Design a protein with these regions (language model features):
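Exposed, low-structure sequence patches enriched in small/polar residues
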Residues: 1-242
Length: 242
């Protein structure tokens, strides 16, 4: 049996620029059915999983040339990706806004919300699970400069990942998934990375740095879906997994 049957993929990108410096891009792709020979970590009894064909589109609209405002918006609906297979459909949107009122300060915010049906997750050996997956990501930042001497940067990244409605499967030796009567818990993951960094130039190529960082990851097996609560968990107790 050939466990290295690679799918073929094809994509087309159309792009149009406007006089107001905005840019519109449409991308479509197709990926043939094939085998994922990585997901089971080379487990001998089930070395690969058969994956269906994939296809979808992505629309992007942006203006990254504005003097005070820059923005980007994306909308996606796809089954898998151009270079990665998936069992179910996913849809996502994201946006980014950057505001620079003066040359000395800028603010930015990025947000993404992704939902995927039948997200396939390897658990151990030939045991896998499918879930209703949702991932929300927020990234914010502030950059401030005063002349060539002072620089202050603040950045925060927060991830809220949930996997609901779990269903267990056992993979056989020809890549098929057989539904199994095994109880799997839901998953709620919170991830935080936060940093404030101040830099002072003592003299050319000689700097003083003052840095504060906070981060952590919390995994719990519950069904909390409130975004604020999930984001708050690693702030309160960044090393707690249950």
């Amino acid at each position: 049996t050939d466990g290295n049957k690679e799918p073929t993929d094809f994509s087309v990108t159309l792009e149009n620029g406007f006089k107001n410096f905005t840019d519109l891009q449409l991308k479509v792709f197709f990926r043939s059915s094939g085998r994922d020979n990585l997901i089971t970590r080379k487990y001998e009894a089930s070395p690969y999983i058969n994956m269906p064909k994939g296809y979808g589109y992505e629309i992007q609209y942006m203006n990254m040339s504005g003097k005070k405002y820059k923005f980007m918006m994306n909308l996606m609906r796809r089954k898998g990706e151009e270079y990665a297979s998936a069992l179910g459909w996913n849809k996502a949107y994201d946006f980014m806004v950057e505001y620079t009122p003066t040359d000395s300060i800028s603010y930015s915010i990025f947000y993404q919300d992704l939902k995927e049906k039948d997200w396939l997750n390897w658990l151990e050996n030939n045991l896998l699970g499918t879930y209703e997956k949702r991932q929300r990501l927020t990234v914010g930042g502030i950059n401030w400069f005063k002349g060539d001497k002072h620089e202050l940067r603040l950045k925060a990244q927060m991830v809220a990942f949930t996997a609901r409605s779990p269903q267990a499967y056992l993979a056989n030796n020809i890549g098929d998934l057989i539904q199994a009567d095994i109880a799997l818990p839901p998953i709620t993951l919170s991830d935080l990375a936060f940093q404030i960094r101040y830099r002072y130039e003592i003299k050319p190529l000689s700097y003083f740095y003052l840095v504060y960082t906070k981060g952590g990851r919390v995994v719990q097996y519950d069904e909390e879906d409130n975004l604020g609560e999930i984001y708050q968990r690693p702030w309160d107790d960044p090393e707690t997994d249950t």
